[in-house]
Amino acid sequence: MNHAGMLALVKKRKRPVEAGAQGQVEVKFKEVTLELVERKMGSSRRNFLTRLARSKGFRVEDVLSDDVTHVVAEDNQAEVLWAWLMGHGLRDVSRLALLDISWFTDSMREGRPVRVETRHSIQNTPTGTDCSPPTAVANVSQYACQRRTTTENHNNKIFTDVMEELAESSEFNESKGPCLAFRQAASVLKSLPSAVHCLKAIQGLPCLGEHTKAVMEEILTFGRSFKVEEIRCDERYQALKLFTSVFGVGPKTAEKWYRRGLRSLQEILTEPNIQLNRMQRAGFLYYSDISKAVSKAEAKAVGCIIEDTFHWIAPDAILALTGGFRRGKEYGHDVDFLLTMPEIGKDEGLLLHVIDRLKDQGILLYCDYQGSTFDVSKLPSCRFEDMDCFQKCFLILRLEQGQVEGERGLQRDPGDSRGWRAVRVDLVAPPVDRYAFALLGWTGSRFGRDLRTFAQKERQMLLDNHALYDKTKKLCLLATTEEDIFTHLGLEYVEPWQRNA
């Protein structure tokens, strides 16, 4: 492979626009105007954050005025800030959102103004701290499949973000126990209907061990986790996180590259002894696109392409959007679809026809097809595998600007003049009699993993993407819908949008 020729794929950073030069950058979010408080932040850091925000399409004022909607401060006492605001003679201070720097950080990471949560707001007067449990302890199950978690009730993001970073670090260190513990803790905290203000509020809640509680106590006391800040500065963690952001690169490959002394994507591309596989080459080739989040509008546009293609081949075909978008998420890393035919056997070779049609349309940038190895005679499987045996393909498609509805259109970098972007798409085609199990599994999140654990430990059943096997009756249970599976397990049905565990 000609690595040198791929260097052009890794773009050089553009020189940032100086503070005070908002006119040089397009303002994407006209409903939001920021003011960064220099006190405690310092002028150099304020200038840097101003340039960063403007580069992402935010309007930032240099002087506080009535045009400002969001005031962002760092390490300031609430009463001092509010006194400072009152002294500026603004028409209506009550309409301002006075926010901690964490809101700004979250917004920069997402590339858009995130929803203001309680943890972001700097309140004028303390309202008192509620240390009662956020919900009856008896109602919080140890199993995510018995909890309802939407995208709206994540009131403890200050904790769950830290837990997920600690879990990721543990995964890089191949520490399976701590990794699982932190992810279970994050899942429980996500399900709570209100914010946790003290440790007394979580007494009796499941999956919150002493290590987790110690981390939460540190956050409650200092507003941050020093362990996570240490991890973020760790060279190995930074390298592995960067390398695994490339499509086709897992933790083991990332670790191997790190041990060879590589620290950047450029170094990987210029290292003559590294042989990238086909998926990894595509990952580098389209890195600037597929490392960005996919919006719901983009997922909908991809859905129209897949639906039109699929129904052109088979008008009676069955198609479902799965993954995070089925759970109601606004953004995701890729777009997943389940495809099948109403008659058993008609699904054979289905994806190959879809792939050929996408090629004919000139929008197929990459394809990795895997044929079916599903064998009903080998059911049940006593060990769950992360990847099922159905035919599937991992694609990268070209999505045009005109195909995406809404004002924002495609997710692109400022200055990107292309009228298209690359999007990752996964297609899975199970037989119709396995469709319900595959749909449940591919909807994803910890909910599905805990559902399998619940089935085995509480019901003596084996559940995976292929079947539900009753070990007592020694037979596979039939299901044509997800509701059927919940009924077999003796569980209340949980809607997809309530499965964001």
From Swiss-Prot:
<dbReference type="Pfam" id="PF14791">
    <property type="entry name" value="DNA_pol_B_thumb"/>
</dbReference>
<keyword id="KW-0548">Nucleotidyltransferase</keyword>
<dbReference type="InterPro" id="IPR029398">
    <property type="entry name" value="PolB_thumb"/>
</dbReference>
<dbReference type="InterPro" id="IPR002054">
    <property type="entry name" value="DNA-dir_DNA_pol_X"/>
</dbReference>
<dbReference type="InterPro" id="IPR001726">
    <property type="entry name" value="TdT/Mu"/>
</dbReference>
<keyword id="KW-0460">Magnesium</keyword>
<feature type="binding site">
    <location>
        <position position="334"/>
    </location>
    <ligand>
        <name>Mg(2+)</name>
    </ligand>
</feature>
<dbReference type="Pfam" id="PF14716">
    <property type="entry name" value="HHH_8"/>
</dbReference>
<keyword id="KW-0808">Transferase</keyword>
<protein>
    <recommendedName>
        <fullName>DNA nucleotidylexotransferase</fullName>
        <ecNumber>2.7.7.31</ecNumber>
    </recommendedName>
</protein>
<dbReference type="GO" id="GO:0006259">
    <property type="term" value="P:DNA metabolic process"/>
</dbReference>
<feature type="region of interest" description="Involved in DNA binding">
    <location>
        <begin position="249"/>
        <end position="253"/>
    </location>
</feature>
<dbReference type="GO" id="GO:0046872">
    <property type="term" value="F:metal ion binding"/>
</dbReference>
<dbReference type="InterPro" id="IPR019843">
    <property type="entry name" value="DNA_pol-X_BS"/>
</dbReference>
<dbReference type="GO" id="GO:0005634">
    <property type="term" value="C:nucleus"/>
</dbReference>
<dbReference type="InterPro" id="IPR018944">
    <property type="entry name" value="DNA_pol_lambd_fingers_domain"/>
</dbReference>
<dbReference type="InterPro" id="IPR028207">
    <property type="entry name" value="DNA_pol_B_palm_palm"/>
</dbReference>
<feature type="short sequence motif" description="Nuclear localization signal">
    <location>
        <begin position="11"/>
        <end position="17"/>
    </location>
</feature>
<dbReference type="InterPro" id="IPR010996">
    <property type="entry name" value="DNA_pol_b-like_N"/>
</dbReference>
<dbReference type="Pfam" id="PF00533">
    <property type="entry name" value="BRCT"/>
</dbReference>
<feature type="domain" description="BRCT">
    <location>
        <begin position="24"/>
        <end position="121"/>
    </location>
</feature>
<keyword id="KW-0780">Terminal addition</keyword>
<feature type="binding site">
    <location>
        <begin position="333"/>
        <end position="336"/>
    </location>
    <ligand>
        <name>a 2'-deoxyribonucleoside 5'-triphosphate</name>
    </ligand>
</feature>
<keyword id="KW-0539">Nucleus</keyword>
<dbReference type="InterPro" id="IPR036420">
    <property type="entry name" value="BRCT_dom_sf"/>
</dbReference>
<dbReference type="InterPro" id="IPR001357">
    <property type="entry name" value="BRCT_dom"/>
</dbReference>
<dbReference type="InterPro" id="IPR043519">
    <property type="entry name" value="NT_sf"/>
</dbReference>
<dbReference type="InterPro" id="IPR027421">
    <property type="entry name" value="DNA_pol_lamdba_lyase_dom_sf"/>
</dbReference>
<dbReference type="InterPro" id="IPR022312">
    <property type="entry name" value="DNA_pol_X"/>
</dbReference>
<feature type="binding site">
    <location>
        <begin position="441"/>
        <end position="442"/>
    </location>
    <ligand>
        <name>a 2'-deoxyribonucleoside 5'-triphosphate</name>
    </ligand>
</feature>
<feature type="binding site">
    <location>
        <position position="336"/>
    </location>
    <ligand>
        <name>Mg(2+)</name>
    </ligand>
</feature>
<comment type="function">
    <text>Template-independent DNA polymerase which catalyzes the random addition of deoxynucleoside 5'-triphosphate to the 3'-end of a DNA initiator. One of the in vivo functions of this enzyme is the addition of nucleotides at the junction (N region) of rearranged Ig heavy chain and T-cell receptor gene segments during the maturation of B- and T-cells.</text>
</comment>
<dbReference type="InterPro" id="IPR027292">
    <property type="entry name" value="TdT"/>
</dbReference>
<dbReference type="Pfam" id="PF14792">
    <property type="entry name" value="DNA_pol_B_palm"/>
</dbReference>
<feature type="binding site">
    <location>
        <begin position="324"/>
        <end position="329"/>
    </location>
    <ligand>
        <name>a 2'-deoxyribonucleoside 5'-triphosphate</name>
    </ligand>
</feature>
<dbReference type="GO" id="GO:0006303">
    <property type="term" value="P:double-strand break repair via nonhomologous end joining"/>
</dbReference>
<keyword id="KW-0479">Metal-binding</keyword>
<feature type="binding site">
    <location>
        <position position="426"/>
    </location>
    <ligand>
        <name>Mg(2+)</name>
    </ligand>
</feature>
<dbReference type="GO" id="GO:0003677">
    <property type="term" value="F:DNA binding"/>
</dbReference>
<dbReference type="GO" id="GO:0006304">
    <property type="term" value="P:DNA modification"/>
</dbReference>
<dbReference type="Pfam" id="PF10391">
    <property type="entry name" value="DNA_pol_lambd_f"/>
</dbReference>
<dbReference type="GO" id="GO:0003887">
    <property type="term" value="F:DNA-directed DNA polymerase activity"/>
</dbReference>
